[in-house]
Amino acid sequence: MISVIISGHGDFPIALKESSGMIFGEENNLIAVPFFKGEGIQTLQEKYHQALKDIPEEHEVLFLVDIFGGTPYNAAASFIAEDQRMDMAAGVNLPILLEVLSLREHLALKDLLNNLKAMSQQSFQVCSEHLEKVKTANQDTREDEL
């Protein structure tokens, strides 16, 4: 089982957790750790330390943070460097969190991260590209009817 700590600037991790709850319901071992204006990296590391106390020893731990190289990322990196059962992915969004929640009971952490790499490219979509595909398909259908 993989426990998840979502972290990021402001209320972002709290909102992300609430949004996932609207879709999947309440999840165990999903912890939101916000980083607020005026807090330093030591404060955030203490929040992580407190969150980790609530996670069973046998669980792997995935930190999902908003920005690569930001304070939430840097604070988590110090824990990951000390514990091989932990890792992190930056650039979290709702589709990525939902993917994690749907797979975390079935995959090991490294396998889950590999899935996320592939999935993250698919979660970013441009509407006009899809509309163009529909338009082209409709034109092809009309031409076939003639």
From Swiss-Prot:
Instruction: From the Swiss-Prot or TrEMBL record, state where the protein is found.
Output: Cytoplasm
Question: What induces or represses this gene?
Answer: By fructose and LevR.
Active-site residues are H9
Q: Which controlled-vocabulary keywords does the entry list? A: Cytoplasm, Kinase, Phosphoprotein, Phosphotransferase system, Sugar transport, Transferase, Transport
**Which positions carry Phosphohistidine?**
H9
- Keyword Cytoplasm listed: yes
Which GO molecular function entries does the Swiss-Prot or TrEMBL record give? kinase activity; protein-N(PI)-phosphohistidine-sugar phosphotransferase activity
One Gene Ontology CC term in the entry? transmembrane transporter complex
Residues forming the PTS EIIA type-4 domain are 1-124
Q: Carries keyword Ribosomal protein?
A: no
Query: Which domain of life, per UniProt?
Result: Bacteria
Q: Which GO terms describe its biological process?
A: phosphoenolpyruvate-dependent sugar phosphotransferase system
What task does this protein carry out?
The phosphoenolpyruvate-dependent sugar phosphotransferase system (sugar PTS), a major carbohydrate active transport system, catalyzes the phosphorylation of incoming sugar substrates concomitantly with their translocation across the cell membrane. The enzyme II LevDE PTS system is involved in fructose transport. LevD and LevE act as negative regulators of the levanase operon. They may be involved in a PTS-mediated phosphorylation of a regulator.
Q: What is known of its domains?
A: The EIIA type-4 domain is phosphorylated by phospho-HPr on a histidyl residue. Then, it transfers the phosphoryl group to the EIIB type-4 domain.
UniProt protein name: PTS system fructose-specific EIIA component
Phylogenetic placement of the source organism? Bacteria, Bacillati, Bacillota, Bacilli, Bacillales
